[in-house]
């Protein structure tokens, strides 16, 4: 058993919270501590109703394992293109190669803002598509600096922030979490090593993939073949 989550970055964007903000860190603690408390209560309630299994005798629990955060790449596409698991969105627009063809996927939260400004135009989406899905090159009269901060993509976010949020989350996860990191091909080995050491020092149990490719150059479909059994 391992209850997980999906759509973390999409949730933050819906709330208008940049991934690397203090408020996002606070939400990490509040939400995952709340999930842990409710999961434990649910397991205790099940133990009262159905009894404790032999391997849980004396614990008051029905389950030995409770939480595990899977990648959920496939599921996130199925439900409409929200962010996968706890991972930031890799791009604000990208091509998706699926079984039924190739599709263009857009960040719905970004699209809402562009629609509200009357700027949901191919011109801006085409620009982002040629810039690896980044919104940072849009004119400031189209997206303010604050809005650009909100729509930073996975490769554009400081990877130490992912690690620090994951460390907070890990306190409430009895198993582990699918934590990917993204680095530019020109990032120094020293920086990459620093991020990995920080993850170890903060008590993160595992790291999953280290990304160095662009979702635009490789399309999202190619990422979905990583691990069929755990992808979700």
Label the predicted regions.
Residues 1-7, 12-30, 153, 170-188:
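Conserved alpha/beta enzyme-core scaffolds, especially Rossmann-like or related mixed alpha/beta domains
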Residues 7-10, 14, 30, 34, ...:
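Alpha-helical scaffold segments in soluble metabolic enzymes
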């Amino acid at each position: 058993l391992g209850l997980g989550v999906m759509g973390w970055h999409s949730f933050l964007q819906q709330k208008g919270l940049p991934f690397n903000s203090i408020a996002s860190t606070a939400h990490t603690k509040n939400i995952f501590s709340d999930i842990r408390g409710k999961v434990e209560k649910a397991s205790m309630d099940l133990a009262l109703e159905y009894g404790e299994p032999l391997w849980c005798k004396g614990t008051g629990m029905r389950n030995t394992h409770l939480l595990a955060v899977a990648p959920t790449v496939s599921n996130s596409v199925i439900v409409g293109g929200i962010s996968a698991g706890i991972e930031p969105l890799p791009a604000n627009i990208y091509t998706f190669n699926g079984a039924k063809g190739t599709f263009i996927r857009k960040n719905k939260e970004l699209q809402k803002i562009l629609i509200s400004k009357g700027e949901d135009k191919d011109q801006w989406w085409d620009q982002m598509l040629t810039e690896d899905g980044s919104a940072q090159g849009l004119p400031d009269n189209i997206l303010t600096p604050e809005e650009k901060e909100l729509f930073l993509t996975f490769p554009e976010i400081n990877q130490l922030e992912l690690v620090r949020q994951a460390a907070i989350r890990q306190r409430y996860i009895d198993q582990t979490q699918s934590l990917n990191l993204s680095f530019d091909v020109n990032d120094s080995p020293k920086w990459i090593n620093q991020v990995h050491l920080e993850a170890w020092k903060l008590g993160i149990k595992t790291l999953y993939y280290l990304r160095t490719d662009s979702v635009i150059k490789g399309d999202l479909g190619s990422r979905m073949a990583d691990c069929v059994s755990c992808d979700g």
